Amino acid sequence: MVFEWDNKKNEYNKKKHDGIGFEFAVRVFLDEKRIEKYDYKHSTATEDRWNVIGMVDDVLFVVYTERDDKTRIISARKATQEESDEYYDNYDFR
């Protein structure tokens, strides 16, 4: 996979989400137990968005889109308790 992101958005994301940068968040795609879902709420006629929940030191929630054969990171943050529960319950390995 080839990743890209907007550098200004990445800096904003770090400030907003406890230092979680996109260069760190891309590691979520290495998690074989990750959960990926289509984001119906935020997708548009011109852009499909996806959510992925996976483990990178802690459970992360990452939003991305596919653009020109690249995975473009839109946002990344620590998963909420509900999202973490979904991740752990899906594989029952707590």
Predicted regions and their residues:
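Ribonuclease/tRNase effector modules and their secretory precursors
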Residues: M1-R94
